[in-house]
Amino acid sequence: MLHHEDESSPESDSDFDASELTDKELQEAFSQGKLKPGLNVVLEGKKKPFNDASGLKQSLKDLKNELPWVERLDVTVDPVVDTTGQNGQTDPNTSDINAEDDFQREMCFYRQAQAAVLYSLPRLRKLKVATKRPDDYFAEMAKTDQHMQKIRHKLQLKQASMEKSEKAKQLRALRKYGKKVQVEVLQKRQKEKSAMVTQIKKYQKGLSDKLDFLEGDQTPKKTPNKTGGSAAAQKAKNTPSAKRRYKDQKFGFGGKKKGSKGNTKGSYNDVSGFRGSVAHGKGPHRPGKKGGKNANKRPGKNVRQKMKSKRR
C-alpha cells in the first residue's frame, strides 16, 4: 500500500499543480475584468502583422560583423562540370537535376563541395593556412565509414529495385504481345484446318479431283494461256501428281490383277533366273531323285529298332 501511494503521489501532485495553475490564471483574468457570463476567458482578435523594416535592419546591423574571410570561410560556387556525363548532365546548371533521383542529388552535392575545395585551397595556401592534419591528429568524422557504406548499400538496393520493376513492366508488355501473337497463330491454324476439312469433304463427294494440302502447295496455280505456254509448263501439266503416282505404285492402274504376273510374254522371255548346271543335273543336289552322292543314308526300320534296344 505504501509503495502504491508513493508511485501515485507524483501524478497527483502534477495534477494538483496544473489545476492550481489554471485557477491562478482564472483569478488573474477575473481581476483584469476579462471574464464575462458564459466565457472563461475573452478571446482576443488576431493581431495585425506589421513589418518593422527599420528595426530588422538595425538588428541585422547589430549582428553583422565585418570579419576577414579566414574567419568566415564562406564561398559561393557552382558545381564542377560533370565531364563524364554519367548522370546525363555535362554543364554546371543545377536546374536540370531531378531532385527525386537520389544519385543525381548526391552527385550534385559532391560536385559542389569539390568546386568549393578547388576554390578555397589556393586562397588558404596563399594566406599560409595549414590545410593538412598533423600525423598525430585524430578526429572522427561526423558520419562514420560504416554509416556511409549503409547509405550506399541502401541506394544501390533502391536502384536495383527500380530496375527490377522496369524489367517487370517490360516483361508484362512482352507477355501481352506474345499472347496476341499466339491467338493470331491459333486462329490461322483453325482457319487452315477448316479449309482442309472442306477440301476433304468436296473430294469425298466427287466435287474436286485433287487435294492441295497433300502436295504442300495451297496456293492456286495459274492456268497458262490457251495460245501459248512454255514446254516445261506443258510437261509439268501432263505429269501426274505425287498422290497419283503413289496410288499407282500401290494399287496398280486398274483392271484385272489375278494372274497378271505369270504366263505372259514378258515372263516367258525372262531368263534371268535360269541356271544351266541345275537344269541339266550337273548340280550338287537334285531333289526327288534317289542315289547319287547326296542319297538318303538313313538306316532302315529294323536297324533302328536294334540300335534302340542296344541303348536300353
Curated annotation (Swiss-Prot):
Start-end of Acidic residues biased regions: 8-20
Segments of this protein annotated with the region Disordered: 1-32, 211-312
Keywords, in A-Z order: Coiled coil, Nucleus, Ribosome biogenesis
Transmembrane feature ranges: none
InterPro entries: Ebp2
Coiled-coil region(s): 140-176
Subcellular location: Nucleus, Nucleolus
Basic residues bias: start-end ranges: 282-312
Cellular component, GO annotation: nuclear periphery; nucleolus; preribosome, large subunit precursor
A single GO BP: rRNA processing
Similarity section: Belongs to the EBP2 family.
Role: Required for the processing of the 27S pre-rRNA.
Name this protein carries in UniProt: Probable rRNA-processing protein EBP2
Organism, scientific name: Xenopus laevis (African clawed frog)
Taxonomic lineage from the root: Eukaryota, Metazoa, Chordata, Craniata, Vertebrata
